[in-house]
Protein backbone atom coordinates (compact mmCIF):
# COMPACT_ATOMS: atom_id res chain seq x y z
CA UNK A 1 0.00 0.00 0.00
CA UNK A 2 1.45 3.36 -1.07
CA UNK A 3 -1.15 5.45 0.69
CA UNK A 4 0.22 8.39 2.63
CA UNK A 5 0.03 7.64 6.35
CA UNK A 6 -1.03 11.21 7.11
CA UNK A 7 -3.65 11.41 4.35
CA UNK A 8 -6.58 11.14 6.83
CA UNK A 9 -5.37 14.31 8.54
CA UNK A 10 -5.53 16.49 5.43
CA UNK A 11 -8.43 18.92 5.61
CA UNK A 12 -11.04 17.89 2.99
CA UNK A 13 -11.94 20.42 0.34
CA UNK A 14 -14.68 20.86 -2.26
CA UNK A 15 -13.68 22.79 -5.38
CA UNK A 16 -10.66 24.08 -3.49
CA UNK A 17 -12.79 25.38 -0.60
CA UNK A 18 -12.17 23.90 2.84
CA UNK A 19 -15.07 22.06 4.43
CA UNK A 20 -13.75 22.49 7.98
CA UNK A 21 -16.44 25.06 8.99
CA UNK A 22 -19.14 22.58 7.93
CA UNK A 23 -17.49 19.71 9.82
CA UNK A 24 -17.24 21.82 12.98
CA UNK A 25 -21.03 22.28 12.99
CA UNK A 26 -21.69 18.50 13.13
CA UNK A 27 -21.58 18.31 16.97
CA UNK A 28 -24.57 20.67 17.07
CA UNK A 29 -26.63 17.93 15.39
CA UNK A 30 -25.76 15.46 18.17
CA UNK A 31 -26.34 17.69 21.18
CA UNK A 32 -29.99 18.41 20.57
CA UNK A 33 -32.02 20.64 22.87
CA UNK A 34 -35.22 19.25 24.42
CA UNK A 35 -38.41 20.32 22.63
CA UNK A 36 -40.83 18.54 24.96
CA UNK A 37 -41.67 18.75 28.63
CA UNK A 38 -40.27 15.25 29.17
CA UNK A 39 -36.83 14.74 27.55
CA UNK A 40 -35.80 11.39 26.12
CA UNK A 41 -33.11 9.13 27.57
CA UNK A 42 -30.27 10.59 25.52
CA UNK A 43 -31.13 14.11 26.63
CA UNK A 44 -31.41 12.97 30.26
CA UNK A 45 -27.94 11.39 30.01
CA UNK A 46 -26.63 14.55 28.36
CA UNK A 47 -27.99 16.80 31.12
CA UNK A 48 -26.69 14.43 33.83
CA UNK A 49 -23.18 14.54 32.36
CA UNK A 50 -23.27 18.33 32.11
CA UNK A 51 -24.35 18.64 35.75
CA UNK A 52 -21.67 16.17 36.88
CA UNK A 53 -18.87 17.93 35.00
CA UNK A 54 -20.09 21.34 36.13
CA UNK A 55 -20.11 20.23 39.77
CA UNK A 56 -16.59 18.78 39.58
CA UNK A 57 -14.99 21.57 37.56
CA UNK A 58 -16.64 24.76 38.82
CA UNK A 59 -16.69 24.08 42.59
CA UNK A 60 -13.27 25.69 43.11
CA UNK A 61 -14.22 28.93 41.36
CA UNK A 62 -15.53 32.10 42.94
CA UNK A 63 -18.57 34.00 41.71
CA UNK A 64 -16.62 35.71 38.95
CA UNK A 65 -15.07 32.48 37.72
CA UNK A 66 -18.44 30.73 37.58
CA UNK A 67 -19.56 33.15 34.87
CA UNK A 68 -17.43 30.97 32.55
CA UNK A 69 -19.52 27.87 33.25
CA UNK A 70 -21.44 27.96 29.97
CA UNK A 71 -18.26 28.59 27.99
CA UNK A 72 -16.37 25.70 29.59
CA UNK A 73 -19.28 23.26 29.29
CA UNK A 74 -19.72 24.17 25.63
CA UNK A 75 -15.99 23.68 25.11
CA UNK A 76 -15.82 20.19 26.64
CA UNK A 77 -18.94 19.03 24.77
CA UNK A 78 -17.61 20.39 21.48
CA UNK A 79 -14.18 18.78 21.80
CA UNK A 80 -15.56 15.44 23.05
CA UNK A 81 -18.19 15.16 20.32
CA UNK A 82 -15.69 16.22 17.64
CA UNK A 83 -13.18 13.61 18.81
CA UNK A 84 -15.82 10.86 18.91
CA UNK A 85 -17.16 11.73 15.46
CA UNK A 86 -13.61 11.52 14.15
CA UNK A 87 -13.46 7.84 15.11
CA UNK A 88 -16.14 6.97 12.56
CA UNK A 89 -14.87 5.42 9.30
CA UNK A 90 -14.10 7.84 6.45
CA UNK A 91 -14.53 10.83 8.75
CA UNK A 92 -12.28 13.76 9.55
CA UNK A 93 -11.19 14.92 13.01
CA UNK A 94 -10.71 18.71 13.23
CA UNK A 95 -8.83 18.39 16.53
CA UNK A 96 -5.91 16.74 14.70
CA UNK A 97 -5.21 20.17 13.19
CA UNK A 98 -2.78 22.15 15.34
CA UNK A 99 -4.01 25.42 13.85
CA UNK A 100 -7.56 24.78 15.04
CA UNK A 101 -6.47 23.77 18.54
CA UNK A 102 -4.28 26.86 18.83
CA UNK A 103 -7.25 28.89 17.65
CA UNK A 104 -9.24 27.53 20.59
CA UNK A 105 -6.45 27.72 23.17
CA UNK A 106 -5.13 31.24 22.61
CA UNK A 107 -8.44 33.18 23.02
CA UNK A 108 -9.40 31.20 26.14
CA UNK A 109 -5.94 31.58 27.69
CA UNK A 110 -5.79 35.27 26.77
CA UNK A 111 -9.22 35.83 28.31
CA UNK A 112 -8.11 34.37 31.65
CA UNK A 113 -4.85 36.35 31.66
CA UNK A 114 -6.58 39.63 30.79
CA UNK A 115 -9.14 38.99 33.52
CA UNK A 116 -6.34 38.46 36.03
CA UNK A 117 -4.44 41.64 35.10
CA UNK A 118 -7.65 43.66 35.11
CA UNK A 119 -9.07 42.45 38.43
CA UNK A 120 -5.94 41.43 40.39
CA UNK A 121 -2.95 43.21 38.79
CA UNK A 122 -0.67 42.95 41.84
CA UNK A 123 -1.31 39.24 42.33
CA UNK A 124 -0.91 38.55 38.61
CA UNK A 125 2.44 40.34 38.54
CA UNK A 126 3.49 38.52 41.71
CA UNK A 127 3.35 35.22 39.79
CA UNK A 128 6.40 36.33 37.81
CA UNK A 129 8.52 36.59 40.96
CA UNK A 130 8.14 33.95 43.71
CA UNK A 131 8.49 35.19 47.25
CA UNK A 132 11.97 34.91 48.78
CA UNK A 133 13.82 34.85 45.45
CA UNK A 134 17.51 35.86 45.78
CA UNK A 135 18.27 39.21 44.14
CA UNK A 136 20.76 37.86 41.53
CA UNK A 137 18.13 35.36 40.28
CA UNK A 138 15.30 37.88 39.89
CA UNK A 139 15.89 38.75 36.18
CA UNK A 140 16.29 35.09 35.20
CA UNK A 141 13.16 33.99 37.07
CA UNK A 142 11.08 36.77 35.55
CA UNK A 143 12.16 35.65 32.07
CA UNK A 144 11.45 31.98 32.87
CA UNK A 145 8.01 32.73 34.33
CA UNK A 146 7.14 34.92 31.34
CA UNK A 147 8.12 32.17 28.91
CA UNK A 148 6.15 29.58 30.87
CA UNK A 149 3.10 31.84 30.79
CA UNK A 150 3.19 32.24 27.01
CA UNK A 151 3.85 28.51 26.49
CA UNK A 152 0.56 27.56 28.19
CA UNK A 153 -1.73 27.89 25.11
CA UNK A 154 0.83 26.14 22.92
CA UNK A 155 1.04 23.25 25.40
CA UNK A 156 -2.76 23.00 25.44
CA UNK A 157 -2.95 22.77 21.66
CA UNK A 158 0.02 20.43 21.18
CA UNK A 159 -1.21 18.01 23.88
CA UNK A 160 -4.63 17.65 22.27
CA UNK A 161 -3.23 17.39 18.74
CA UNK A 162 -0.55 14.84 19.63
CA UNK A 163 -2.83 12.51 21.60
CA UNK A 164 -5.62 12.45 19.01
CA UNK A 165 -3.21 12.13 16.07
CA UNK A 166 -1.23 9.31 17.71
CA UNK A 167 -4.38 7.31 18.37
CA UNK A 168 -5.63 7.69 14.82
CA UNK A 169 -2.24 6.64 13.44
CA UNK A 170 -2.24 3.48 15.56
CA UNK A 171 -5.75 2.58 14.44
CA UNK A 172 -4.77 3.21 10.81
CA UNK A 173 -1.62 1.06 11.06
CA UNK A 174 -3.25 -1.86 12.88
CA UNK A 175 -6.28 -1.71 10.58
CA UNK A 176 -4.00 -1.88 7.53
CA UNK A 177 -2.09 -4.78 9.09
CA UNK A 178 -5.34 -6.65 9.77
CA UNK A 179 -6.43 -6.24 6.16
CA UNK A 180 -3.04 -7.34 4.82
CA UNK A 181 -2.80 -10.38 7.10
CA UNK A 182 -6.30 -11.60 6.26
CA UNK A 183 -5.02 -13.12 3.01
CA UNK A 184 -1.97 -14.69 4.69
CA UNK A 185 -3.08 -16.08 8.05
CA UNK A 186 -6.61 -15.84 9.36
CA UNK A 187 -5.46 -16.67 12.90
CA UNK A 188 -2.96 -13.81 13.04
CA UNK A 189 -5.49 -11.54 11.36
CA UNK A 190 -8.07 -12.37 14.05
CA UNK A 191 -5.59 -11.57 16.80
CA UNK A 192 -4.73 -8.27 15.11
CA UNK A 193 -8.41 -7.45 14.75
CA UNK A 194 -8.92 -8.09 18.47
CA UNK A 195 -6.11 -5.64 19.21
CA UNK A 196 -7.74 -3.15 16.86
CA UNK A 197 -11.07 -3.49 18.67
CA UNK A 198 -9.47 -2.93 22.08
CA UNK A 199 -7.51 0.02 20.72
CA UNK A 200 -10.72 1.55 19.38
CA UNK A 201 -12.31 1.28 22.83
CA UNK A 202 -9.20 2.93 24.27
CA UNK A 203 -9.44 5.74 21.73
CA UNK A 204 -13.06 6.38 22.69
CA UNK A 205 -11.88 6.86 26.27
CA UNK A 206 -8.95 9.02 25.15
CA UNK A 207 -11.28 11.20 23.07
CA UNK A 208 -13.36 12.04 26.13
CA UNK A 209 -10.40 12.28 28.52
CA UNK A 210 -8.55 14.74 26.27
CA UNK A 211 -11.64 16.94 26.07
CA UNK A 212 -11.84 16.90 29.87
CA UNK A 213 -8.10 17.62 30.28
CA UNK A 214 -8.19 20.54 27.82
CA UNK A 215 -11.17 22.12 29.57
CA UNK A 216 -9.80 21.38 33.05
CA UNK A 217 -6.53 23.17 32.28
CA UNK A 218 -8.43 26.20 30.98
CA UNK A 219 -10.46 26.07 34.19
CA UNK A 220 -7.26 26.02 36.27
CA UNK A 221 -5.89 29.02 34.35
CA UNK A 222 -9.17 30.77 35.07
CA UNK A 223 -8.95 29.88 38.76
CA UNK A 224 -5.44 31.35 38.99
CA UNK A 225 -6.62 34.64 37.49
CA UNK A 226 -10.10 35.10 38.99
From Swiss-Prot:
Any one GO biological process: proton motive force-driven ATP synthesis
Intracellular or extracellular location(s): Mitochondrion inner membrane
Function: Subunit a, of the mitochondrial membrane ATP synthase complex (F(1)F(0) ATP synthase or Complex V) that produces ATP from ADP in the presence of a proton gradient across the membrane which is generated by electron transport complexes of the respiratory chain. ATP synthase complex consist of a soluble F(1) head domain - the catalytic core - and a membrane F(1) domain - the membrane proton channel. These two domains are linked by a central stalk rotating inside the F(1) region and a stationary peripheral stalk.
GO cellular component, one term: mitochondrial inner membrane
CDD domains linked to this entry: ATP-synt_Fo_a_6 (cd00310)
Family classification: Belongs to the ATPase A chain family.
Coiled coil segments of this chain: none
Pfam family, one: ATP-synt_A
InterPro entries (alphabetical): ATP_synth_F0_asu, ATP_synth_F0_asu_AS, ATP_synth_F0_asu_bact/mt, F0_ATP_A_sf
Membrane topology field: Multi-pass membrane protein
Keywords: ATP synthesis, CF(0), Hydrogen ion transport, Ion transport, Membrane, Mitochondrion, Mitochondrion inner membrane, Transmembrane, Transmembrane helix, Transport
Domain of life: Eukaryota
Quaternary structure note: Component of the ATP synthase complex composed at least of ATP5F1A/subunit alpha, ATP5F1B/subunit beta, ATP5MC1/subunit c (homooctomer), MT-ATP6/subunit a, MT-ATP8/subunit 8, ATP5ME/subunit e, ATP5MF/subunit f, ATP5MG/subunit g, ATP5MK/subunit k, ATP5MJ/subunit j, ATP5F1C/subunit gamma, ATP5F1D/subunit delta, ATP5F1E/subunit epsilon, ATP5PF/subunit F6, ATP5PB/subunit b, ATP5PD/subunit d, ATP5PO/subunit OSCP.
Major subcellular site: mitochondrion
The keyword Transport is annotated on this UniProt entry: yes
Transmembrane segments: 6-26, 68-88, 97-117, 138-158, 164-184, 195-215
Reactions this protein catalyses: H(+)(in) = H(+)(out)
Gene Ontology MF terms in the entry: proton channel activity; proton-transporting ATP synthase activity, rotational mechanism
UniProt name for this protein: ATP synthase F(0) complex subunit a
